[in-house]
Each structure stands twice: as C-alpha cells, then as structure tokens.
A protein has these predicted regions:
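Contiguous segments within soluble domain cores/interaction surfaces
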Residues: 1-117
C-alpha cells in the first residue's frame, strides 16, 4: 500500500492487521508500534536515527474502520525526531516496516511504502 505524506504533518496509514487465524486485530488490541524507515531504492540503508523508532499508542489520533478488513490509522506523531525529519527528503519513496504489538505482546509486521510530497 502507498501513502502520500507531507514531511511537516501527521500522517495516515491504511492497514489490515490480522492474527494467525485471520481474525481482524482491533486498534484497541494494539499496545505499541515500532517502525523502521529506509529509502525504497536502497532498502538496506536505514535512515539515520530511525531503526526501531517508537510511536506509542498515545500518538494515535484515531483509527477509523474504512472497510470490513481495514482501519485507517491517523498518527499525531511529530514528523521530527531528535530535530531530524522522519522522512528527510522530498519526492522520495520510503519503505516503512511496521511492527505492531498486541495486548499479549505478540508482534505483527508488514511493509508500507511512503511517498513524500
């Protein structure tokens, strides 16, 4: 899935998160989020400072169900971390690996491609 984001605003990610049985995981079952950001054309190069950047659930503005099997997560996370932009270059596609931890501490992971404006 591709999401276009501004480098100076909050961002939204549309995600389908299921457990091993295919049951939809609800936003209330998500206790933590970790993301790893790398440039899509150089996937082995992690953007400095963002290996396992944490977004607590307090940084989630909302989670709206957009279909039977997907929620749109709107993060209020500041796009700057330690005074560095989360997505530092305009017009670049980043590969974002999302790791979700449920209420039992079980991790779920999936890729999201982020196109900066």
């Amino acid at each position: 899935m591709n999401k276009k984001v501004s480098t100076v605003s909050s961002y939204k990610i549309l995600a389908k998160i299921t457990d091993c049985d295919g049951t939809l995981v609800l936003p209330s079952q998500v206790t933590a989020i970790k993301i790893k950001i790398s440039e899509y054309l150089a996937p082995d190069v992690v953007v400095d400072g963002y290996d396992l950047y944490n977004i607590g659930t307090a940084g989630m503005l909302s989670a709206t169900q957009t279909s039977e099997d997907g929620f749109e997560y709107n993060f209020a996370a500041n796009p700057f971390h330690d005074n560095k932009p989360m997505f530092p270059r305009h017009g670049v596609t980043y590969l974002v690996e999302l790791v979700w931890y449920d209420e039992d501490g079980k991790p779920y992971a999936g890729p999201v491609y982020v196109d900066t404006l």
